[in-house]
């Protein structure tokens, strides 16, 4: 049965309550008509957009590999794009941005600086971040670049070989086509950055709820020394897969670029 993502009810509480994560997803992962819609936004709950996307440049790859810019129209809670689907096969959507991530050193700990409005924060010793209000001109600070990709796939009529996207900051290789996922069939994703295996990358999987009161499904793992990560998805439904650079020790000054890729997937059977 076809299921529109935004008709589903979700109740998963995000791990990071101080920020909304970006995502992009089709209105349906399997389409039949000549046009479909793609949604993007910032959300705390999987697929539950609260703020329209901003800061990202989006591109569409059609089944033949042709790439074109994908403009999105914003309303307050979400952004939407119209996609012509005249060809059969798999379409890829990718949004990209580059941002500065600021860290500050306090009590010999390098902590990420977050612009949070929360005035009832836990003591600093119990947090892994620092607020803008706690930083002053005498506080040692450093910035690194973070490269964000948001990616999704949908197919018309049939799935087709994924077009290699040379623009992706984090290269992804799938053991199973993203639109052909099946229950209890392991999904192996090969991760690479600039041609080198992305080892020890953090991977978190969140499942969209289908009904009120449904238990949260959250999986966490890391990529191995060859950049492979194995995901065992045991329930049908829509998933957000977040892949990010390894964490650095708080006493170590951040110097390297960091990467985050957020993928929207669906398992229908």
Enumerate the language-model features and the residues they cover.
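Short, aromatic- and glycine-rich surface loops/edge beta-strands on solvent-exposed regions
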Residues: 89-101, 238-245
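Positively charged n-region of N-terminal signal peptides that target proteins for export
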Residues: 1-4
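Beta-strand-rich domain onsets/edges
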Residues: 20-36, 121-187, 192-201, 209-213, ...
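Start-of-domain marker
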Residues: 20-81
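N-terminal signal peptide c-region/cleavage motif recognized by signal peptidases
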Residues: 14-16
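Glycine-centered loop-to-beta-strand initiation motif
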Residues: 76-79, 87, 219-237
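Short amphipathic beta-strand segments in non-cytosolic proteins
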Residues: 59-67, 202-220
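Short acidic/polar inter-strand loop motif in beta-rich domains
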Residues: 97-109, 247-253
């Amino acid at each position: 049965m076809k299921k529109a993502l935004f008709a589903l009810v979700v109740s998963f509480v995000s791990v990071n309550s101080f920020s909304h994560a970006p995502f992009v997803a089709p209105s349906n992962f399997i389409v039949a008509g000549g046009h479909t819609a793609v949604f993007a936004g910032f959300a705390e709950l999987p697929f539950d957009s609260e703020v329209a996307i901003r800061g990202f440049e989006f591109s569409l790859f059609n089944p033949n590999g042709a790439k074109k810019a994908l403009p999105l129209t914003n309303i307050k809670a979400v952004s939407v794009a119209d996609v012509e689907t005249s060809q059969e096969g798999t379409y890829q959507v990718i949004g990209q941005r580059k941002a500065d991530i600021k860290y500050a050193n306090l009590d010999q700990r390098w902590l990420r600086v977050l612009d949070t409005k929360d005035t009832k924060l836990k003591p600093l010793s119990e947090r892994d971040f620092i607020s803008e209000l706690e930083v002053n001109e005498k506080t040692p600070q450093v910035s690194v670049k973070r490269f964000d990709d948001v990616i999704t796939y949908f197919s018309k009529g049939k799935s087709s070989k994924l077009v290699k996207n040379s623009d992706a900051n984090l290269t992804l290789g799938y053991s199973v086509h993203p639109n052909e996922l099946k229950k209890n069939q392991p999904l192996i994703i090969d991760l690479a950055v600039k041609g080198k295996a992305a080892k020890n990358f953090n991977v978190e999987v969140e499942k969209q709820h289908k009904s009120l009161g449904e238990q949260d499904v959250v999986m966490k793992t890391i990529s191995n020394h060859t950049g492979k990560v194995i995901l065992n998805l045991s329930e049908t439904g829509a998933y957000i897969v977040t892949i990010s650079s390894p964490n650095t020790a708080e006493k170590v000054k951040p110097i390297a670029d960091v990467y985050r890729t957020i993928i929207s997937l669906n398992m229908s059977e």
